[in-house]
């Protein structure tokens, strides 16, 4: 079994309040969840209105599938013009590592 996690550090564009931040982040999180059927949540910078960290995780029997899904999530987030992807921190674990 393979487990992949990824933290995507994101700078939000023209956002001036936490309410505006939610209107950008929630649809993005929902789109990731819908397209890839994986666990996803806002996991960092929750109190800053122009930054967020989105965390995703995927489990599969195949390491290549885990890598493909996390790469696709990164491309999806990077393709949104209202956000700028600052950094991506993927991690891969085998059940034998745990």
Regions found by a protein language model. Name each.
Residues 36, 52, 84-86:
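Residue-level signal for beta-strand positions within conserved beta-sheet cores that form or flank
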Residues 62-98:
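C-terminal structural segments of small proteins and small subunits
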Residues 6-10, 54-56, 88-90:
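A structural signal for short, well-ordered beta-strand segments
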Residues 12-14, 60, 94:
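Non-catalytic surface loops within mature trypsin-like serine protease
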Residues 12, 42-44, 92:
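Short, well-ordered turn and helix-capping elements at secondary-structure junctions
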Residues 3, 41-62:
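Short, charge-patterned binding micro-sites
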């Amino acid at each position: 079994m393979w487990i992949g996690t990824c933290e995507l550090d994101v700078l939000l564009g023209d956002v001036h309040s936490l309410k505006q931040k939610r209107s950008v982040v929630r649809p993005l999180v929902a789109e990731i969840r819908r397209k890839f059927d994986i666990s996803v949540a806002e996991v960092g910078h929750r109190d800053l209105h122009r930054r967020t960290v989105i965390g995703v995780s995927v489990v599969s029997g195949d390491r290549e599938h885990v890598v493909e899904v996390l790469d696709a999530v990164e491309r999806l987030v990077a393709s949104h013009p209202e956000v700028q992807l600052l950094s991506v921190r993927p991690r891969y674990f085998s059940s034998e590592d745990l």
